[in-house]
Amino acid sequence: MKLRIISGSLKGRMIKAPDSNLTRPTTDRVRETIFNLLHNKIDFDGISVLDFFAGSGALGFESISRGASNVTFIEKNYPIYKNLLENIKSLNLEESCEIVKSDAVQFAKYTTDKRFNLILADPPFFQYSIYEVVKYVFGNNLLSEEGYFIVERSIQTLKKDVEGFGKEPFKRIGDTCLYEFTKSTEAKPEGD
């Protein structure tokens, strides 16, 4: 399956979605909504982006296309990691992209020396480690003062997610729910 970059300097370029039942690429409609919402909040020029559960890298590539200076992709599955590496090479983005082959929770838990202006997470819908990721992002101060952290989830996990994040989604698009976190609206995930 091929995905297209929606806007910016890479508009229309195609990337390959991994051949895996472990990923569910963010649809064009959801990506467009996310970035239209962010466009009103963030100046993308020169920002640093973190893309958890990176998969094809579509969210990170949209960020680069709109002006982000660099993206750190977090992906633990080796075949998906390899696909992501191929996408980076096909777009000639080796200098502005880094892939960390790691579990998202482990990266968030043990990274203490980096700050990101934008953090994006599109975990598998029925994986609940995202609550720990959010907790460690704020516990380790990974989000910059004026930064945004957007998490994509399914309407099917709404009740558990509202409990886990301590907040309602800020946007619903079909069966997708988006949660927004900032330093001023920091979530209080379960276990705190």
Identify the residue ranges that each predicted region occupies.
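Class I S-adenosyl-L-methionine-dependent methyltransferase catalytic core
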Residues: 1-192
